């Protein structure tokens, strides 16, 4: 039997749900650009800067693309991995490469403002929009920021801390709203 420590508990949020909703917002922007004649249907391309090619990142960008495709079924996506959680220069560089490859929306599963900065600094005829992760990028990308997704850990942490303080079991499955 595995050793058990009463004060040890692991947890993780289902961020893919928020990524799906953010993808819907991205799809709505793509549709608006198509309907306004700014881009053609074949130009509905999304770029995604991911940290590492593992399950959480893959499920996140898959959910994001599915959300976008719920509005624009022919949207496509290119993913570039930085192999780091926190590398501003590489994240910005890869976002710029995706923009150079004609991506209209850039999202990320990495931890810096590099992708948002790349979107804001772009000087192309077609605007490039940013969908962030874990924090708003409105102050960094005021003209290109669309939306973002993050987990609100406060309800879970409050529940877990209350359980520990009151010598109760921390719930194994806690559901919240997206």
Model-found features: residue ranges?
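A residue-level marker of the well-folded mature domains of exported/periplasmic proteins
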Residues: 1-178
């Amino acid at each position: 039997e595995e050793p058990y420590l009463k004060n040890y508990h692991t947890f993780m949020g289902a961020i893919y749900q928020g990524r799906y909703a953010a993808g819907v917002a991205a799809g709505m922007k793509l549709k608006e650009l198509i309907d306004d004649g700014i881009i053609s249907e074949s130009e509905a391309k999304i770029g995604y800067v991911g940290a590492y090619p593992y399950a959480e990142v893959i499920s996140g960008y898959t959910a994001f693309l599915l959300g976008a495709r719920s509005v624009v079924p022919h949207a496509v996506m290119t993913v570039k991995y930085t192999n780091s959680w926190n590398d501003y220069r590489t994240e910005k560089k890869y976002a710029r490469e995706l923009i150079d490859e004609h991506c209209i929306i850039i999202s990320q599963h990495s931890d810096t403002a590099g992708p948002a900065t790349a979107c804001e600094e772009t000087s192309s005829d077609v605007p490039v929009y940013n969908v962030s992760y874990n924090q708003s990028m409105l102050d960094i990308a005021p003209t290109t920021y669309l939306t973002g997704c993050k987990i609100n850990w406060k309800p879970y942490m409050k529940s877990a801390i209350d359980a520990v303080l009151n010598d109760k079991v921390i719930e194994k499955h806690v559901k919240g709203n997206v």
